[in-house]
Regions:
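Universal eukaryotic N-terminal targeting presequences
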Residues: 1-2, 462
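Bacterial N-terminal signal peptides
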Residues: 2-10
Length: 462
């Protein structure tokens, strides 16, 4: 997949993105939930991708995990270690005036949940930790490919023997190495014993100070992202098994399987799921995307690392630290007379909800709807493109969402003056696009002179 990394896109201003928290599984009321963090530093994609997959592609069948995959979300988007300093050095004390104060407060609240008994923090570090010096990238001062603990043992009701659990995890990971050079080792920082000023400020030390087990898993920044995430997941799965948590996943746990999972098709749904953007090797620019003047700018995504961000007169979609597409809006009034339409797909009639995708082998047709016009982006036949049989050869490839020229938008509009009966919209849990510019009166007047947007559907040709 082709990406351009626009980590300079937003300059220095704050994006105000809050980290996500997801739950997977069901608590057995035994205070045995495992809490997993990723992305505490924004330049460590192996960790935050591994954490994200635990929510999108794992199914916890026994027990429960809580995952916050994108702790420093602004920094992840900007590919920065920490826009307000190192977030992982703010757990001993933090000023209420610090921009990260609320973030640290939320993280601590998760750690202190009574149900949480084990915490795993995912990192990517340069080089490979080795107990004895080999060379500049393989020595005791490096962090990559290590299981990190703060001390051998803690006073905890569950999982007090940190060294034993981490050693078993190291052995488990080393049984599935891609290359012997990637071997994991146990790294005990002996934080309190040595009075390590930096590690005393870290998240894991805060955890063990509250009598809960904490492990940091480090993958090497010298490895590709998919391989880092692979090693993270090997370690995580062993910790989950230690806690008696059972699971399935949608992909094979191999470097290739992880790569495919990380780079799977992204979905972004806009404005109460009226619009779906299916991003499969997407075009860098998507023009004339309907944006409402009479409702909030909200969205949902298929994973917790994807965000829609306002920037000047446009918006862009970012997946972790990878740029996906820039959206140029067309501001319109939105209408809600219905939320699904009839399609004829390859001679079969079907009902399709807005914000979904239909696969087409040969052709499709949208029956005429009274007081509604259909606009098939890339077809360019007439003002209303209903009751027309459309095949792939009729489409103009530059207007597709994807570089392959297979995915196209089909939009539905209420004719101006039709005044169709409105129905109550379904409430959809969503995120808000923050920092969008305030629209001027000219833009509002122009929007109110146009047909009203109802919703859209994607068609994907074989």
């Amino acid at each position: 997949m082709f990406y351009i990394d626009y980590f300079f896109i937003s300059g220095l201003f704050a994006l105000d993105l809050e980290f996500s928290v997801g739950e997977n599984g069901k608590s057995l009321d035994d205070n045995n939930t495992v809490l997993i963090f990723g992305g505490i530093q924004g330049d460590e994609p192996g960790g935050f991708h591994a954490a994200s997959l635990l929510l999108s592609d794992y199914n916890i069948t026994k027990g429960k995990i809580i995952v916050a995959p994108n702790l420093a979300f602004d920094s992840i988007i900007k590919r920065s270690r920490g826009k307000n300093g190192d977030l992982n050095r703010k757990f001993a004390s933090i000023s209420p005036k610090d921009p990260d104060y609320q973030t640290v407060k939320r993280i601590k609240e998760l750690i202190l949940l009574p149900e949480v008994s084990m915490v795993i923090n995912l990192h990517d570090g340069w080089g490979f930790y080795k107990p004895t010096y080999i060379d500049a990238m393989q020595n005791p001062k490096r962090w990559g490919n290590s299981s990190v603990i703060d001390t051998n043992e803690i006073n905890a009701s569950k999982y007090p023997d940190l060294e034993s659990i981490a050693t078993q995890t190291v052995n488990s990971v080393n049984a599935s190495l891609v290359d012997p050079k990637h071997a994991y080792h146990l790294k005990n920082t002996k934080t309190q014993e040595l009075g390590d000023a930096e590690m005393l400020k870290a998240l894991t030390y805060f955890v063990i100070s509250n009598r809960k087990a904490a492990f940091a898993n480090e993958a090497s920044k010298n490895l590709p992202v998919n391989l880092r995430a692979y090693y993270h997941l090997l370690a995580i799965e062993n910790y989950l098994k230690t806690a008696g948590i059972e699971f399935t996943r949608t992909f094979e746990l191999t470097p290739q399987g992880v790569d495919k999972a990380i780079n799977q098709e992204l979905e972004v749904k806009l404005f109460d799921d009226k619009i779906l953007l299916s991003l499969k090797n997407p075009r860098q620019v998507i023009n004339y995307v309907p944006f409402p003047v009479n409702k909030e700018l909200n969205y949902n995504t298929s994973n917790e690392l994807t965000a829609v961000i306002a920037e000047n007169n446009s918006f862009y979609i970012q997946y972790g630290n990878r740029f996906q597409a820039r959206l140029y809006p067309e501001y319109l009034e939105f209408s809600n007379p219905f939320n699904e339409v009839t399609f004829q797909v390859d001679s079969n009639e079907t009902t399709v909800p807005f914000g979904t995708k239909v696969k087409v082998k040969e052709n499709f047709l949208i029956p005429k709807i009274a007081n509604v016009r259909v606009n098939i982006i890339g077809f360019d036949h007439s003002k209303d493109e209903s009751n027309i049989l459309v095949s792939k050869k009729n489409m103009q490839k530059p207007y597709s969402l994807d570089m392959a020229g297979k995915i196209y938008r089909v939009e539905f509009y209420e004719l101006r003056g039709a005044n169709l009966q409105q129905f109550l919209e379904n409430s959809v849990e969503s995120k808000l696009i923050k920092n969008a510019k305030i629209l001027d009166l000219a833009t509002l007047r122009t929007a109110r002179a146009k047909d009203k947007f109802i919703g859209s559907i994607l068609v994907e040709f074989e």
